[in-house]
Amino acid sequence: MTRVQFKHHHHPD
């Protein structure tokens, strides 16, 4: 569940 947080930090849709 850490990958989801990383993606959100990259570009939060």
Swiss-Prot record:
Name assigned to this protein: his operon leader peptide
Gene transcribed to yield this protein: hisL
GO BP, one annotated term: L-histidine biosynthetic process
Similarity comment text for this entry: Belongs to the HisL family.
Taxonomic source organism: Shigella flexneri
Keywords: Amino-acid biosynthesis, Histidine biosynthesis, Leader peptide
Taxonomic superkingdom: Bacteria
InterPro entries: His_leader (IPR012565)
ATP-binding as UniProt keyword: no
UniProt function note: This protein is involved in the attenuation mechanism for the control of the expression of the his operon structural genes.
Pfam families xrefs: His_leader
